[in-house]
């Protein structure tokens, strides 16, 4: 089964939300208190997905707000260098800064992030800074859950979703739950549900769907039944090492297993998964193959130091899939 888009659109994907700075520990297996050197990368889920999509050959654009400083200029320059259109990235003139994420890599199983997100520029994207014509010219709009955490970014995203629905642009909601940006579980559930019910494709981990539903131990069947009663026609639920599932409105269920790899760190997997899954759909692969692309891409990124810089090319993804299938005798 294949997923179809309006092929008359110029952009394959336009993402909206945060673009920030990742400072990843260059010294492994030690606590942050003892870490002295970090490597700088562009971070933020929607920015990573846009970068990953561009590296896979898709035409990607980005809507967001950056600070008027060295970090802001680095973000724009880096994304442009990776092929992302940044014409809709506005500059904050009020002195707000980029979000900073310091990562600690104690072991492949124990990684943590120290996040600085107070009064950051990306959460001050105004609805008036969302261009209708730009979104209307995309096959899909990628929305990140974190952008819903505060106003005015929240209203800017809701406006973008409204525009997409108006112009036959598929809405892809990457749940991207980050607890440090939200005031309460109830608030998170309200806004996640609001956008999920308007989305054509919803992607997240089982835990993130539980956050959206404000409960624990939820089941996939109940989740997809609720979303299919609204706008969704494809729901992807990830279960970590147990693989991922895609549920279609027509009743079909697809599964991809997680690919074995030497894990360096745990962050970045979700963004690389989303970009490769989207690439698979846009390039005309069937849903099961797109799931495999997502799983393979995630396994590549968790084996490397960065998230955005480690986003693989299509050839790397296909090579890994073929190698694993050969190893498994398939």
UniProtKB/Swiss-Prot annotation:
It comes from the Bacteria. The keyword Transport does not apply. InterPro entries: Carboh/pur_kinase_PfkB_CS (IPR002173), DKG_kinase_firmi (IPR022841), Myo_inos_IolC (IPR030830), Myo_inos_IolC-like_sf (IPR023314), PfkB_Carbo_kinase (IPR050306), PfkB_dom (IPR011611), Ribokinase-like (IPR029056). Pathway: Polyol metabolism; myo-inositol degradation into acetyl-CoA; acetyl-CoA from myo-inositol: step 5/7. Pfam families: PfkB. One of its GO terms (biological process) is inositol catabolic process. One of its GO terms (molecular function) is ATP binding. It catalyses: 5-dehydro-2-deoxy-D-gluconate + ATP = 6-phospho-5-dehydro-2-deoxy-D-gluconate + ADP + H(+). Disulfide bonds: none annotated. NCBIfam families: myo_inos_iolC_N (TIGR04382). Catalyzes the phosphorylation of 5-dehydro-2-deoxy-D-gluconate (2-deoxy-5-keto-D-gluconate or DKG) to 6-phospho-5-dehydro-2-deoxy-D-gluconate (DKGP). This is 5-dehydro-2-deoxygluconokinase.
């Amino acid at each position: 089964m294949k997923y179809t888009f309006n092929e008359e659109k110029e952009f394959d994907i336009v993402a909206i939300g945060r673009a920030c700075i990742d400072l990843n520990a260059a010294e492994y297996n030690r606590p942050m208190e003892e870490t002295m050197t970090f490597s700088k990368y562009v971070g933020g889920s929607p920015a990573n997905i846009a970068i990953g999509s561009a590296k896979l050959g898709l035409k990607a654009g980005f809507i967001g707000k950056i600070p008027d400083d060295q970090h802001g200029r680095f973000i724009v320059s880096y994304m442009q260098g990776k092929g992302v259109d940044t014409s809709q990235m506005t500059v904050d003139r009020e002195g707000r800064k980029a979000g900073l994420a310091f990562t600690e890599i104690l072991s492949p199983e124990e990684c943590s992030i120290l996040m600085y997100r107070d009064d950051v520029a990306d959460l001050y994207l105004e609805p008036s800074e969302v261009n209708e014509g730009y979104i209307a010219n995309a096959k899909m709009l990628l929305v990140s859950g974190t952008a819903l955490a505060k106003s005015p970014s929240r209203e800017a995203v809701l406006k973008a979703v409204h525009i997409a629905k108006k112009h036959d642009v598929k809405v892809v909601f990457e749940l991207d739950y980050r607890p440090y940006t939200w005031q309460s579980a109830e608030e998170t559930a309200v806004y996640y549900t609001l956008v999920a019910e308007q989305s054509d494709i919803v992607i997240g981990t089982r835990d993130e769907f539980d956050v959206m539903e404000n409960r624990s131990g939820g089941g996939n069947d109940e989740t997809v039944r609720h979303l299919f009663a609204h706008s969704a026609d494809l729901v992807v639920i990830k279960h970590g090492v147990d693989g991922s599932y895609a549920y279609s409105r027509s009743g079909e269920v697809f599964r991809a297993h997680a690919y074995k790899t030497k894990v360096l760190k745990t962050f970045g997997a979700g963004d690389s998964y989303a970009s490769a899954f989207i690439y698979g759909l846009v390039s005309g692969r069937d849903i099961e193959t797109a799931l495999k692309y997502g799983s393979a891409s995630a396994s590549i990124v968790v084996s490397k130091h960065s998230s955005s810089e480690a986003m693989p090319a299509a050839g790397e993804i296909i090579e890994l899939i073929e190698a694993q299938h050969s190893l498994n005798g398939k």
